[in-house]
Amino acid sequence: MRKEKSLGLAAEMRKLAEASREAARALSHADPRRKDAALRAAAEAIGRREKRILSENARDVAAARAAGQNAAYLDRLRLDPKRLAGIGAALHEIAGLRDPVGEVTASWRRPNGLEIRKVRIPLGVVLMVYEARPNVTVDAAALCLKSGNAAILRPGSDALRSSLALAAAFAEGLEKAGLPAASAQVVPTPDREATYELLALDDLIDLAIPRGGPSLIRAVAARSRVPVLKHYQGVCHLYLDASAPPQQAVDLALNGKVQRPGVCNATECLLVHRGAAGKLLPPVGRALADAGVELRCDPTALTILKRAGVAAVPARPDDFGKEFLDKILAVRVVADLDGALDHIARYGSLHTEAIVTRDLASARRFQREVDASAVMVNASTRFNDGGELGLGAEIGISTTKLHAFGPMGLAELTTQKFLVEGEGHVR
């Protein structure tokens, strides 16, 4: 029985992917105005279908609550009229972005007269695997459509009802614009095997992008025959150099940790130069503790903070290199910039690293030697975001160096091909 079920599911997923492949062919040369019209029509459809979408979302939330999911998880899953309006606004924003397809990124003429251009083209079919965030269903579908890609959307089972309801509204927009319905498809079953069947279809799917916790990303990477671009964990460090201005150190530490502690570009570890730790740690630690942050410190940092009357606890060995996604911060005193670079090289996740310093030489060295998708000088780790960097909306922040590194906007959902024009040239 299980084998028959598996064969049936495999055939169903292949049929779904084949439909996406056909849609991708049409989207690769679709009129940009038609794509934008679909996005705007989808936004209007979400508004009209609000009652239905919220009803399905309420069922998802109730089931997740009954399954014992925590408050933060339920908050990510929950939709309300304001959040739905935000999803609609995001569709209008994406419609207003510049279409990357067909952009000429370079051109030159060879001595033999050949005219050569490099132009952006869609990737093809993108499989998005993500956890219980219904908004990702629409964001991913919209970004893929705008960049000429077909999207296969695999939400976590807890968000399946919400995602199907949102996808129905998106399909209405596609239909009104005369684009293929298979341009954006939600996998209609919660069966985990469906994901693995899709990940085996490297003849039909061009890229898989997992967004979620480490276990999800490891599972996708281990089982996939399709190239995987990982939106992995953000173990982001803030290093306070010897010359760091105290108030700036306080401001950046607070913003990085407290503004939204549950996101991937939140600061997870504070490193402080030994020569300035006595001056910097007490005000920074006090501000963080007053904001409700639990400080998990190495022995040196713990001694300094305790002496200053700041609440702190000893760090466990595994606190360094951990993505807390909560009001928890690992704190370590390092000997100098070399010590900070060594720590980041060992514990960083290639996401975002930041330094606070007045020393230009230290700043430039930090930029050169730190391996991360974004390196901040006197700016919060929270700025590693497509919108904040001026890229527009993003599908995720890649910690994989191939094919994109950092926030993935529309351009990162394309590749490039060469267009070569001659006059009967032979080699």
Swiss-Prot record:
Tell me, what does this protein do in biology?
Catalyzes the NADPH-dependent reduction of L-glutamate 5-phosphate into L-glutamate 5-semialdehyde and phosphate. The product spontaneously undergoes cyclization to form 1-pyrroline-5-carboxylate.
Which CDD domains does the UniProt entry name for this protein? ALDH_F18-19_ProA-GPR
Q: Which InterPro entries match?
A: Ald_DH/histidinol_DH (IPR016161), Ald_DH_C (IPR016163), Ald_DH_N (IPR016162), Aldehyde_DH_dom (IPR015590), G-glutamylP_reductase_CS (IPR020593), Glu-5-SA_DH (IPR012134), GPR_dom (IPR000965)
Q: Could you identify this protein by its name?
A: Gamma-glutamyl phosphate reductase
Q: In which pathway does it act?
A: Amino-acid biosynthesis; L-proline biosynthesis; L-glutamate 5-semialdehyde from L-glutamate: step 2/2
Predominant location category: cytoplasm
Name the family the entry cites: Belongs to the gamma-glutamyl phosphate reductase family.
One CC-aspect GO term: cytoplasm
Enzyme Commission identifier(s): 1.2.1.41
What Gene Ontology terms describe what this protein does at the molecular function level?
Answer: glutamate-5-semialdehyde dehydrogenase activity; NADP binding
One Pfam family name is Aldedh
Output the GO biological process annotations, alphabetical, semicolon-separated.
L-proline biosynthetic process
Localization (cell): Cytoplasm
Describe the reaction catalysed, as an equation. Answer: L-glutamate 5-semialdehyde + phosphate + NADP(+) = L-glutamyl 5-phosphate + NADPH + H(+)
Which terms are listed as keywords in the entry? Amino-acid biosynthesis, Cytoplasm, NADP, Oxidoreductase, Proline biosynthesis
Question: Keyword Oxidoreductase on this protein?
Answer: yes
From the record, give the transmembrane residue ranges: none
